[in-house]
From Swiss-Prot:
GO biological process, one term: DNA replication
Keyword Cytoplasm applies: no
Species this protein is from: Human cytomegalovirus (strain AD169) (HHV-5)
Location of cross-link Glycyl lysine isopeptide (Lys-Gly) (interchain with G-Cter in host SUMO1): 410
Subunit text: Forms homodimers. Interacts with host SMARCB1. Interacts with host NCL/nucleolin; this interaction is important for the organization of proteins within viral replication compartments. Interacts with UL112/UL113; this interaction is necessary for efficient viral DNA replication. Interacts with UL84. Interacts with the uracil DNA glycosylase UL114. Interacts with the DNA polymerase catalytic subunit UL54. Interacts with host IRF3. Interacts with host RELA.
Name used for this protein in its record: DNA polymerase processivity factor
Ranges annotated as biased composition (Basic and acidic residues): 360-376
GO-annotated molecular function: DNA binding; DNA polymerase processivity factor activity
Protein family membership: Belongs to the herpesviridae polymerase accessory protein family.
Alphabetical list of InterPro entries matching this protein: DNA_clamp_sf, Herpes_PAP
Gene Ontology CC: host cell nucleus; virion component
Length: 433
C-alpha cells in the first residue's frame, strides 16, 4: 500500500501575536470607528494595510514585518472589505485579547481563506477579494517638511476640538465652513493654523517644532479631516511629520510611526472661497428718472423716440405702451420717463419761444388739429382737477390761467367736437400692435 503524498500548504501569511496585540491595542480606538469604506490588504512583504477613504481624505495604517511572517514569497496580494457579513468590523475582531491564532491562505485569486482561533473556538471562512483597489503611496517630493512634537499635536487637538462640534447659525466666513488654513512662512520659519472664525495658532522653530524644508505656502483642508488625522497620529505618542506635497495635486501629508506600525493620512486641498465681485445687483441710474421729483421742469425730448409731430395711429400705441411721467406737463414738476418738449417748464423747453421761467406764449404756434390730438392723448391720463401740474421752477409754461392747459378744452379751440370730447378707455384700442 502506497503512502499518500502529503499536499503542500498554500502560501500563508500569519500574525506574530505578541507584537501584533501590542500594536492593535494602541490602535483599538481608531479601528473601532472603521466602517464600510475601509479595505484590508495582505501583502507578501509581509505587511498588512488598512486603508480608509473619506471625502478629501485617505487614511492608511500599515503593520510591518515585526507583526507578520509569511511561509512563501509567492503569496499573492489580497484585498478584502473590512466590513464582512455576520462578522461586522473584521479588524476589530482581531483586536481581541483572546485571539490565539490568525492566518490568511492564498488558495484562489478570487478570495482569501482566513482562519481565526481563540480558546475553545475556531473560525474559518473565505472572503471575496476586492480588485482594482489602489493603495496610496507616500511621495518623497515635498515643498514643506515640518516635524511636530507630540506635545504640539496635543495642543492642536485641544485647540481644534471645541470647533469640530456642529454649531447653529454660523455666519458666512471668508473661507468655507469647517476648514482650517495652514500657512507656512520661510523667513523666519513658522507654521500657522487658522480656523474659520479667525482663531489662529502659530509655531516657530524650536525644540518642539523642526523645519526641514521651508517654502512660503498656503493650504486649506477640512477641519474634521484634519482633526481625525491628528487623533490617528496621536496614538503613537511620538513626533508627527507634516508635509505639503505639490507633485500633482496639492496634498497635506500627516504621518506618525513607531517600530510596529505607521499611520499615514493624505488630505486633499479644499478650494479657497473668494468674494465674487459681481454678486451685487447693480442698478443703473437710467431707471431713476421715472416718477422722480425735481424743480425746474427740465424735460427730455421725445423727438428721439418718435416725437409728437406724427399724427398717425402709431403715436397712440407708442405712448400707451409705456406710462408717461406727468410731473412736467403742468410746468415745474419732476419729469417722467418719456417727456415731450412742448412744455418749457422752468424755462428749459427745447422749443425756445421765449427765454425765462414762464415758458412764453408758444402755444399760439400750435394748430387746432395738433391741440386736438394732444388733448385726445393726454386727457385720460390726468384728472380734470389739474393734478398734473406741479408748483415748481417759475410757474410752468403750459399751465396758463387756472388749470392744466390740455384739460381746458374750451381755450383757443376751433372745433366744437373738441369742446365736448370725453375720452372713454377701451381695452381693445389700447392693445399694442
Amino acid at each position: 500500500m502506497d503512502r499518500k503524498t502529503r499536499l503542500s500548504e498554500p502560501p500563508t501569511l500569519a500574525l506574530r501575536l505578541k507584537p501584533y496585540k501590542t500594536a492593535i491595542q494602541q490602535l483599538r480606538s481608531v479601528i473601532r470607528a472603521l466602517k464600510e469604506n475601509t479595505t484590508v490588504t495582505f501583502l507578501p512583504t509581509p505587511s498588512l494595510i488598512l486603508q480608509t477613504v473619506r471625502s478629501h481624505c485617505v487614511s492608511k495604517i500599515t503593520f510591518n514585518s515585526s507583526c507578520l511572517y509569511i511561509t512563501d514569497k509567492s503569496f499573492q496580494p489580497k484585498t478584502i472589505n473590512n466590513s464582512t457579513p455576520l462578522l461586522g468590523n473584521f479588524m476589530y475582531l482581531t483586536s481581541s485579547k483572546d485571539l490565539t491564532k490568525f492566518y490568511v491562505q492564498d488558495i484562489s485569486d478570487l478570495s482569501a481563506k482566513i482562519s481565526m482561533c481563540a480558546p475553545d473556538f475556531n473560525m474559518e471562512f473565505s472572503s471575496a477579494c476586492v480588485h482594482g483597489q489602489d493603495i496610496v503611496r507616500e511621495s518623497e517630493n515635498s515643498a514643506v517638511h515640518v516635524d511636530l512634537d507630540f506635545g504640539v499635536v496635543a495642543d492642536l487637538l485641544k485647540w481644534i476640538g471645541p470647533h469640530t462640534r456642529v454649531k447653529r447659525n454660523v455666519k458666512k466666513a471668508p473661507c468655507p465652513t469647517g476648514t482650517v488654513q495652514i500657512l507656512v512662512h520661510a523667513g523666519p520659519p513658522a507654521i500657522k493654523f487658522i480656523l474659520t472664525n479667525g482663531s489662529e495658532l502659530e509655531f516657530t522653530a524650536n525644540n518642539r517644532v523642526s523645519f526641514h524644508g521651508v517654502k512660503n505656502m498656503r493650504i486649506n483642508v477640512q477641519l474634521k479631516n484634519f482633526y481625525q488625522t491628528l487623533l490617528n497620529c496621536a496614538v503613537t505618542k511620538l513626533p508627527c511629520t507634516l508635509r505639503i506635497v505639490t507633485e500633482h495635486d496639492t496634498l497635506l501629508y500627516v504621518a506618525s510611526r513607531n517600530g510596529l506600525f505607521a499611520v499615514e493620512n493624505f488630505l486633499t486641498e479644499e478650494p479657497f472661497q473668494r468674494g465674487d465681485p459681481f454678486d451685487k445687483n447693480y442698478v443703473g441710474n437710467s431707471g431713476k428718472s421715472r416718477g422722480g421729483g425735481g424743480g425746474g421742469g427740465s424735460l427730455s425730448s421725445l423727438a428721439n423716440a418718435g416725437g409728437l409731430h406724427d399724427d398717425g395711429p402709431g403715436l397712440d400705441n407708442d405712448l400707451m405702451n409705456e406710462p408717461m411721467g406727468l410731473g412736467g406737463l403742468g410746468g415745474g414738476g419732476g419729469g417722467g420717463g418719456k417727456k415731450h418738449d412742448r412744455g418749457g417748464g422752468g424755462g428749459s423747453g427745447t422749443r425756445k419761444m421765449s427765454s425765462g421761467g414762464g415758458g412764453g406764449d408758444h402755444d399760439h404756434g400750435l394748430s387746432s388739429k395738433e391741440k386736438y390730438e394732444q388733448h385726445k392723448i393726454t386727457s385720460y391720463l390726468t384728472s380734470k382737477g389739474g393734478s398734473g401740474g406741479g408748483g415748481g421752477g417759475g410757474g410752468g409754461g403750459l399751465d396758463r390761467n387756472s388749470g392744466n392747459y390740455f384739460n381746458d378744452a374750451k381755450e383757443e379751440s376751433d372745433s366744437e367736437d373738441s369742446v365736448t370730447f370725453e375720452f372713454v378707455p377701451n381695452t381693445k384700442k389700447q392693445k399694442c400692435g
